[in-house]
Amino acid sequence: QAPKIIETITDNREDDGAGNYFYEFETENGIRQSVRGTPGAAGAVIKTGSFSFPLDDGTLAEFIFEADEYGYRVDSPLIPVAPPNPSHVEELLQIVAQLKAQGAQWNDQGERID
């Protein structure tokens, strides 16, 4: 059986020739993408945008992103997030920061060496 052909229902593209561009598309099965590009530092291109697609259960998977000289960052409610540190870990991190400010040092095994 031949695969079903999915039609593109929206396809917009703009490019000013100076490094700024925009494009967006949407397909009949609910896939969407929108991207804006601008010149960045040292020849880098800064891209921001979003994309989405329907999941099998009918809900929409939505993502926003930014890409630049520092890498690619994406955000979505679907991306797992680590739980917050327990309070005792936060207290220990504060103690370590105070010790570092006082000149304390540790080796690669975590042993204090000052």
Curated annotation (Swiss-Prot):
<feature type="modified residue" description="Pyrrolidone carboxylic acid">
    <location>
        <position position="1"/>
    </location>
</feature>
<protein>
    <recommendedName>
        <fullName>Cuticle protein AMP5</fullName>
    </recommendedName>
</protein>
<dbReference type="Pfam" id="PF00379">
    <property type="entry name" value="Chitin_bind_4"/>
</dbReference>
<keyword id="KW-0193">Cuticle</keyword>
<dbReference type="InterPro" id="IPR000618">
    <property type="entry name" value="Insect_cuticle"/>
</dbReference>
<feature type="domain" description="Chitin-binding type R&amp;R">
    <location>
        <begin position="18"/>
        <end position="83"/>
    </location>
</feature>
<dbReference type="GO" id="GO:0042302">
    <property type="term" value="F:structural constituent of cuticle"/>
</dbReference>
<keyword id="KW-0873">Pyrrolidone carboxylic acid</keyword>
<dbReference type="InterPro" id="IPR031311">
    <property type="entry name" value="CHIT_BIND_RR_consensus"/>
</dbReference>
